[in-house]
Amino acid sequence: MREVYLVEGVRTAIAKAGKKSWFANIRADDLAALVINGLLERAGITGKKREQVDDVFLGGTTLLKEMGSNIGRYATIMAGMPYSVPGCTVDRMCASGLQTISFAIATIAMGWADLIIAGGVQHMTHVPMGTCSDHNPRLGEFCDPNMVSMGYTAEMVARRFNISREKQDQFAYESHMKAHRATVEGLFKEEILPVEAEVPADDGGTRKMVVDRDQGIRPDTSLEALAKLKPVFMQDEKATVTAGNSSQISDAAAAVLVASKEKIKELGLKPKMKLVAYAVVGVDPAIMGIGPAVAIPKALKQAGMTIEQIDLWEINEAFASQAVYCTEKLGIRNHPLLNPRGSGIALGHPLGCTGARIATTLMHEMPYYGAKFAVESMCVGHGQGAAAIWEWVG
């Protein structure tokens, strides 16, 4: 098997989906095309060198409308890539962006390619979750049919494992504070590709803006404000999951450049990250949020490593209930480098993009914090979990 590395990564800022999204007037395929071009420019893959890209793997879910018809290929064409560069789309829901990276690494390791762009995109303003949903009426014969609601599964995690409202709100508050601090200190600046956009204005029109920061971070939130929010997915006396302790729906794109050791040498690139292990698991769909607590031990076993050897943790915050459960189960809830710059609750969770967004963030976090090994993980809709162990080699 050949040696394979991540050599560059870039993402857009994450816009808060809805009528006021900063990316409301940019299509998903155009957003992905911007990231493809930004990635190659940062890596110095310009001009005729672009022909050396063997493939483009793009993750996404709810693959309809502008997210449909193989957006991976569409975005490749819209980026002005040579027609000889193919593209495909991968859907493992919340882990799609990480799955594309693992596919790219495996493809290159097998000797079938040398240079692949892998990433993800999601535009939840233009293609909301549930668009044209057609769930099988026999679903209830196989699992809890309510599992199609991610918020319902978050409530089930909270109830089954006694995750209090206070714990959830505390976790959410910390996410916003960490993300705000990182933004103020400019820690996201290098990973974000500035995007010129016509953003919605307060008067109903639009205004020009360079989008270079994440839209959903709330530095003014407080535990008191979070405590006042009403549950949104269930309304009985046991309900604890609110908009404040759930991830935001988002619009964003991210991509990394994956290359063989030989291609890195040929093009004068610099290896940064190496995939040590990658694991996916299935869990009860009704409590899909526990996925990381199952996937991470599987990845550690693959690598022959222990939790104590991991320096930095990036576990996506789909919901505070599941993030609290997973981190407590793993014994890392108070780890000093657990989501050190916030995650899905504060930054947003652009489903198919998130895995690539986290990998890109890690590319900048690992050298900053002096981390040798890092874990990236997320729960995945319909009862799955994914986890990757990264080694810094830069």
Task: Show which residues each predicted segment covers.
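Active-site pocket-lining segment
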Residues: 155, 188-191, 276-346
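N-terminal extracellular/periplasmic Venus flytrap/periplasmic-binding protein-like
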Residues: 10-13, 24-34, 45, 167-266, ...
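Condensing-enzyme catalytic core mediating Claisen C-C bond formation in acyl metabolism
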Residues: 1-28, 223-290, 294, 301, ...
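Conserved catalytic cysteine-centered active-site region
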Residues: 26, 60-114, 145-152, 220-248, ...
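Conserved beta-ketoacyl condensing-enzyme motif
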Residues: 25-95, 99-115, 121-139, 192-211, ...
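Active-site-proximal alpha-helical scaffold in enzymes
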Residues: 90-121, 158-188, 255-262, 350-371, ...
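Glycine-rich loop/linker segments at domain edges
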Residues: 12-19, 105-161, 219
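Short, well-ordered amphipathic alpha-helical segments that serve as non-catalytic structural scaffolds
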Residues: 28-46, 71-75, 100, 150-157, ...
